[in-house]
């Protein structure tokens, strides 16, 4: 396992926060969308950012 520096951990924390916020925003927008195609696109974007979050989180273990 690679040991991360304090700077790397700080950057990772910032990226995790950003991705988490994007997931929440796109899920909220998807819930409010009336057009099915827009709703699907927004849900897809939320899933993409959730994947980014999961990938970054996996770097912590």
Identify the residue ranges that each predicted region occupies.
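His/Met- and acidic-residue-enriched segments that coordinate or traffic transition-metal cofactors
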Residues: 1-61
């Amino acid at each position: 396992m690679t040991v991360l520096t304090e700077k790397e951990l700080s950057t990772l924390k910032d990226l995790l926060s950003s991705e988490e916020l994007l997931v929440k925003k796109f899920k909220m927008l998807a819930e409010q969308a009336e057009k099915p195609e827009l709703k699907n696109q927004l849900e897809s974007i939320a899933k993409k950012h959730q994947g980014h979050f999961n990938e970054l989180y996996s770097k912590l273990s």
